[in-house]
Amino acid sequence: MRWSFLTVLLWLVSLTGAENGFNGWLRYAPVQCDKRCQRALPSSIVTLNSTDSGPIGTASQELQAGLENIVGKQLSIKRSSCGSRSSILVATLEQYRQACNRSSEVPSLGIDGFWLRAYGDTVQIVGENERGALYGAFEYLSLLAQGNFSHVDYTTSAHAPVRWVNQWDNMDGSIERGYAGPSIFFEDGHIVEDLSRVKQYARLLASIRINGVIVNNVNANATLLTSQNMDGLARIANVFRPYGIQIGISLNFASPDTLGGLGTYDPLDPSVISWWANITDSLYDRVPDMAGYLVKASSEGQPGPDTYNRTLAEGANVFAKALQPHGGILMFRTFVYDHHINESIWTNDRANAQVDFFKELDGQFEDNIKYGPIDFQVREPVSPLFANLYKTNMAIELQVTQEYLGQQDHLVYLSPLWKELLDFDLRVDHQPSLVRDIVSGQRFDRQLGGWAAVVNVGTNTTWLGSHLAMSNLYAYGRLAWSPTDDSQGILQDWIRLTFGRDQNVLDAITDMSMASWPAYENYTGNLGIQTLTDILYTHYGPNPASQDNNGWGQWTRADHDTIGMDRTVKNGTGNAGQYPAEIAQVYEDLDSTPDDLLLWFHHVPYTHRLHSGKTVIQHFYDAHYDGAETAHRFLSQWESLKGRIDQQRYNEVLSRLVYQAGHSLVWRDAINNFYWNMSGISDEKNRLGHHPWRVEAESMTLDGYEPYTVSPFETASNYKAVVTTSNSTTGTAQTKLQFPSGTYDLGVNYYDMYGGKSEWTVYVNDRVVGQWEGNSENTLGHTPSIYIDGHSATRITFRGVEIENGDQLKIVGVPDGVEPAPLDYVVLLPPDVVD
C-alpha cells in the first residue's frame, strides 16, 4: 500500500524548545485540536485478552502517550468487550473473531499484517498477530501526527517475513563502520547495564515494522558466548520482546576452537557439531524466541569451512541444524571473496566471487538459511547471484550506515538507490524477475526470504550522527515492508513526522534529499567506476589510486589512455555472462550498456563517447563540478529554513551541510586532478588548475611554516600544503591581497588530523576575521585520519568579509599533538562563485 497524506484544516502548534533527535520520527509533536476536535476522537483504548508485557500492551501504551501528546487528549486503557463506544480497539485477528463474532467483516491478513479502520471516535486495529497489532497502532499515530484525521479502512501485510537490522557492534563498545558514537549494547567486553537507549531503539524499529536485530558485529568475537554474556543477551531480548522484535547474534566460525578449546572448528567433526548444538541450546534456554544466527565465513580473513576443505554449504548447515529444533533462522553472508587476487591477470574479478562460490551449492543449504557484487558502492549493478540460486532462501543486504557514501557527514538519501535495485528485472528464464520478488521468495516459490540492513546506531542523540541520515533508517523499514512504495512519498512522511508540516520545510528537504544521491555520485565516482574513496584506509575521502595495485579487487584498471573493468565474456572476466541471457546481452555490448554502468563492464579510452555525446573524461570533469555545486545549493536551501526548525537541530544540520559543501570541493578537485594528471587530457571548459580566487598557502610569506608535499598529491590544491616546522612552533602565513575591493566569503582550506587540536586565527590588516580549532573528531562522525590527505582535508568559511585591494592577510597556526596546523589555501569568493 502506498501511504497517502490528506490535507485537513489543522496545523502544527508553534515550534517548541530545542530537540536533540532522540525521538527520531516518533516525536508525537502537537497538532491543533480544539475541544470539538477532541470530542470527535476516541476516549479509551480497549485491548482484548492481552497482557501489558506483550506487543498489544505496548500498543496501548503508545496510543495513550501518542494521543495525549499529539491532540492533548487523555485516554484510559481497558480490557473489555469489542462493543465499547468511542474507543480504539486493539486485538489480534483471532482475538477479534472470538470476542466480536464478526468474522465475515475481517479482511484477510498476510505476514505480520494489520487492518486499520478509523471512523471518528471508533477505531479498530486488528493484527495478524500481536506484532501486527502494534504496527497498526504506530500507523494510526503516524497519520494523526501528520495531521491526517480522515476516515481510513485498509489492510497491509509484510512483503517478506525477515526484516532485520544488523549492528556491527564490538564487545569493547566500538562499532565497525559506525559514525554515531559507541555501542548501545556493549562496553568492556560485556553487555551494558543501562538498556534505556535499547528500549528507545526498539520503539523506532517497531514503528517501521522491523522484526529482528543482530546485536553484534559480523566479524564476531567468540567471547559473546560466555555464560555471563549469554545472560546479558537475555536482558537485551527482554527489552526488545514487547516491541515484537527478536534478537539474533553473529557468530565466529572458529569459536569451538578459540572459546571451546576443541582444537578444531571443522564443521563435520562430531565434537564441533555437538559444541554448536549445546551452545545453541544454552542460548535458547535464555532467549526462547531468539531469531537466529548471522555468519560471515571464509571472507576478509574470517575463519570458515575452507580451512578444512569443506564447502560453504557444509559450513552453514552446522549452524542451521543446531537452530532447527528451536525454529531459528541462519543468515549466511554471501560476501565471500579472496582479497589477495592478482590484478595482473586480466580475467581475475572479485565481482565473480559470489556466483563462483555459491551457484554450484544451490539446493545444498538447509531451508532455514549484499545487493551488489562488490561492497555498498555509490553505484553497482544488481548482484547476479540473485538470478543463480533457485533452491536457496535469499535475503538482500543493504547498508543504512554510509560506509562508502559520506559516513553521515554527507547528506545522501539512499531510498532511490535501493529502489533502482529492487525494481530491476533480472529476466530469469525470460520471465519477469524483479529483485524485490526474488528476495521475498515469490519468484522462485521459496517460503523464506527478506531483508537485512547494516544500521550501526550509537549513543549520539541523533542515533546515526546526523538528523537527516535518519531518513535512511525510516526508508529502509518502509521498503522492507512494501518495496513498491515511492521514495519521495516515504521521505515526505518522514519529514512531516520529524520536522513538522511547514510546506517550506517539506519542499526544501525533499529537494535536497532527492538530489543528494546523484550529487554524491557526481562528485565521487561516475559511470560505474565505484566511489573512488580510499579502500585501504577509511573508506571516506578521495584516493582513486588505492583502488588498483592490490588484491582487494575493486580495480579501475586506469592508465594513461584507458579506464574501466572489462567484464565481458568475449574479452574480459566473464562477469556479464553470470547474468540471465537478456541482461547479459545488454551488459556484454558496449553500445547497449547504460552509461552509468559503462566502466563497470567495459575498459574504454578516456575519449570514448557516451550516449550523451560527451567523452568519458569530460563527463568526469563536468559531473564533479555539477555535484559540488549541488552540495553548495543544499546549504542555501537549508539556510532558508532558519526560524522554521528548532534552533538546535537547525544548527546541527547546518554544521554538517557547511562541511559537506567544503568537502565536496576536496572530492571535486582530487578526482579531476588525478585523472587530468593520468590522462593528460584537459578540461574543455578550462576549469582544472584555474582558480583565480585562491591563494596557495605555500606561495605566501611563511614564518614557522614550511611547504609539505601532500600524499595523495591530488588532495592538495597545488599538490602542496604548509605545516609548522615543529610541533611546538607557531606558524604564520601572510600575503598582500590582489583582489578588487569588495565583500567576499573568505574560505580557508586546511587539514584536521586525528591526534591534535590545532588552533588558527585569520587576520585582515591585524583585524581578527575568524578563529577556529581543529576538533572535527568531536563534531563530525566520519572515520578520522592521522594523515594530511583527502579525509582530513576540510574548509572553514567566514562570510561577508570586507576586503580592500592591497590588504594584508595573515593566518597564525598553533600546532597541537601530532597535528602541525596544516594549511592548503585561502579563497576569497565573490557572490555565487563556487570554488
From Swiss-Prot:
Gene Ontology, cellular component aspect: extracellular region
InterPro entries to which the protein is assigned, alphabetical: A-glucoronidase_C_sf (IPR037054), Glyco_hydro_67_aGlcAse (IPR011395), Glyco_hydro_67_aGlcAse_N (IPR005154), Glyco_hydro_67_C (IPR011099), Glyco_hydro_67_cat (IPR011100), Glycoside_hydrolase_SF (IPR017853), Hex-like_dom2 (IPR029018)
Gene3D superfamilies: Alpha-glucuronidase, C-terminal domain, Chitobiase/beta-hexosaminidase domain 2-like, Glycosidases
Catalytic activity reported: an alpha-D-glucuronoside + H2O = D-glucuronate + an alcohol
Main location: secreted
Subcellular location: Secreted
Entry's family note: Belongs to the glycosyl hydrolase 67 family.
Name the record gives this protein: Probable alpha-glucuronidase A
Organism of this sequence: Aspergillus oryzae (strain ATCC 42149 / RIB 40)
The organism's taxonomic lineage, starting at the top: Eukaryota, Fungi, Dikarya, Ascomycota, Pezizomycotina
